[in-house]
Amino acid sequence: MTDRNHHRAPVPVGDVVPGDPPVPITVWPVPAPHEGETMSNAMGVRLVHNLAHPSDLIIDLAEGPQLARAIIAAHRRSHLQTARPAGWGRESATLIVTGWPVPDASPVDFFLRCRAHLAPGGCVAVLLAHGDVGLPVDVVIAAKRAGLAYLQHIVAADRPPRRGQQAQLAIHTDVLILTRSAIKSGSGDG
């Protein structure tokens, strides 16, 4: 049976996630990462297939082998399994994937380095484990100070929420997708 009563979508009011313009939110149903790892295998596959083409370079700064497996299976090129202080190579990457927080760098310095290694149109994917609800805002502010724009917010939900259950924060990972800002915003307090 087909419902012949068509209902209009509600008119959006305000900005769910602060951004200029508003940032789209996407939900990916993927398994949760194992303890001490940044992502599940399914998350690695989604990131690689959605954010990179076969000839693109991907910089893998994530904990665990999941992204590397996805890169190999998809015949993509990768560079750097850990954040080495010596350098990230000379070639620009289309995708940089990292967990958060990053060791041995201030957030703004880390994002300045990411921006310097991004190819035009490239993205930085920052995976945030559930927990601190203010953390995504802090990450976006640091990225903006480094000249990166907040492009998309992905909610990686490992199970559907249940009515009346207060554990909504413990069922997902936030993935913030950042890209080079068209507007120059130096590393000042802006």
Named regions from a protein language model:
Residues 1-190:
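Class I S-adenosyl-L-methionine-dependent methyltransferase catalytic core
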